[in-house]
Amino acid sequence: MYIQVLGSAAGGGFPQWNCNCVNCKGYRDGTLKATARTQSSIALSDDGVHWILCNASPDIRAQLQAFAPMQPARALRDTGINAIVLLDSQIDHTTGLLSLREGCPHQVWCTDMVHQDLTTGFPLFNMLSHWNGGLQWNRIELEGSFVIDACPNLKFTPFPLRSAAPPYSPHRFDPHPGDNLGLMVEDTRTGGKLFYAPGLGQVDEKLLAMMHGADCLLVDGTLWEDDEMQRRGVGTRTGREMGHLAQNGPGGMLEVLDGFPRQRKVLIHINNTNPILDENSPERAEVLRRGVEVAFDGMSIEL
């Protein structure tokens, strides 16, 4: 299985266009050793030719331009994208669909709840229906697994995560299973397994068991501290309120990942306020000391 990190930042990217927090300002001033990042998205393939896009970020055009296999040039109009899987209906995971309209129709896999959001509060399916067949919905059931024809050796097993629907959603304060998903993706030829959960607010025993069965854990790296947005003066909500488990402290993501010495562990969906973006910070050093990697745009993983 080929895993390509197209974007590794949380919503807004890094540096965020309107932010002057210590990270964003430091990056622009050249006083912070850090790497710019686009908004979170990955691509998966079983042959390096046919790709499944997981989430479509607002930065999708630049992400595709930066990864040559996404333009195989086999025809006058072409793309390496053969299907799209949406893990939720967040704006920073779905807006990229608008930029892919020239390539419609697209096979889009998502849950009933995500499809409901994307036909009501943010009606992308409706909006793009006039573009050469638009978005063709394939339902993700919350039980069992599914296979996408373009990559027949990849088996996708979805699992619901405890997190909120987007602020625009008609059921923002009425959560349902299927609002947010993680994925276990297995290459049935190599046996390699990826646990992918860029929005992970809580970890229970069932999830821990799944994580133990994976070879690579690509998980939520949004915040270092739960109250980071408040500390930095750029927000009022905590990480838990937004559905993100912070890395630091008792019960934090790093403590969770300490229990997985065998697995490759990678943080993704990193917010612009997170001090681990500063490559010279003690927080970054602590992450690396504990055997955890920080995802970056263009990162490639094979399982």
UniProtKB/Swiss-Prot annotation:
InterPro entries: Metallo-B-lactamas, PQQ_synth_PqqB, RibonucZ/Hydroxyglut_hydro
Keywords recorded for this protein, A-Z: PQQ biosynthesis, Transport
Transport in keyword set: yes
Pathway annotation: Cofactor biosynthesis; pyrroloquinoline quinone biosynthesis
Domain of life: Bacteria
Pfam families named among the record's database cross-references: Lactamase_B_2
One BP annotation, GO: pyrroloquinoline quinone biosynthetic process
Family (UniProt): Belongs to the PqqB family.
PANTHER family on file: COENZYME PQQ SYNTHESIS PROTEIN B (PTHR42663:SF7), HYDROLASE C777.06C-RELATED-RELATED (PTHR42663)
Role of this protein: May be involved in the transport of PQQ or its precursor to the periplasm.
Listed name of the protein: Coenzyme PQQ synthesis protein B
Source organism of this protein record: Pseudomonas putida (strain ATCC 47054 / DSM 6125 / CFBP 8728 / NCIMB 11950 / KT2440)
